[in-house]
């Protein structure tokens, strides 16, 4: 048989490469003493705890700063709300004063829509020529008959004096209100400035305290990191010294082949103590290799003999197939010759039959009149 070089399976190649990588990783973990770690890394856990504490302290300082800012904003908002409430109160007071002074009940001129006869009922019955409810349109007072002019003039002067005094009072009250408002605004601005200065000082002190705390934390962390590095360097030096001492005092540098034997599995060896094979082991391996070589040679000869048999059998089969093909061609040619003669005879018989039909049987040909006698009615 012939050997055919087939391409390797990608899945099998990937699996082999994965096993090789896993074996290399295991060897790097097992045989490298410096990188091999047994148990829990307490130092790393402590570092994580310290980092967590530092992060929490930083977050608390940030929250304190945010709280200070929030208090400041709340105070400013309260002051603004108080100022807005004061403005609203002053405006309401002015509106109320205007209503009390300008919109008195006795001076209103509105008409009561619910009582349309109110104006007529306000006028009493006829009292005389000097009745105050009747004017010039009522024909009660004619030209040259103004008997109460002095009274009217006095009342007019009193009205003017009252209006002037009221205007003076309003102007004075407006000036007083304006002065009070200005004084309150000045006091409010002064209080807001003082509060803003206090909050700025408080914020500056918080910032300085935060910076000092951050600097102290960074300094402590740097000192701790330096101590950890020094301890790590010292541990590494001690590990190197221990390794050198172990190499000197152990059986690794000896030439004793018994050191490499595994006490648990005698058929295995310890890789880090193995110094090579003994002459007996090498002789055994050579003997096994020679035996395998002889077996391989015998197998190769057997395969060659089997291949020769297969080749001879293939030649015989090819020759037999060739003979069968020749016989098949001869039979096909004979069959075609017989079929041709049979077809020729059949054609002659059919021609004779057709001539018989045309000359003897089908002598009376139908005319058009014969075909017209059919299908002449609907039934």
From Swiss-Prot:
Where it sits in the cell: the answer is: Cytoplasm, Cytoskeleton, Flagellum axoneme
- Stretches assigned to coiled coil: 43-111, 285-337
> Could you mention a single GO BP entry for this protein?
flagellated sperm motility
Question: Looking at the keywords, is rRNA-binding present?
Answer: no
Whether RNA-binding counts among this entry's keywords is no
Leader peptide range in chain numbering: none
Q: Among the entry's GO cellular component annotations, what is one?
A: sperm flagellum
Task: For this UniProt record, give its keywords in alphabetical order, as a comma-separated list.
Answer: Cell projection, Cilium, Coiled coil, Cytoplasm, Cytoskeleton, Flagellum
The protein's matches in InterPro entries, at most eight in alphabetical order, are given as: RIB43A
Protein family according to the UniProt entry: Belongs to the RIB43A family.
Q: How does it assemble?
A: Microtubule inner protein component of sperm flagellar doublet microtubules.
Provide the protein name: RIB43A-like with coiled-coils protein 1
Gene encoding it? RIBC1
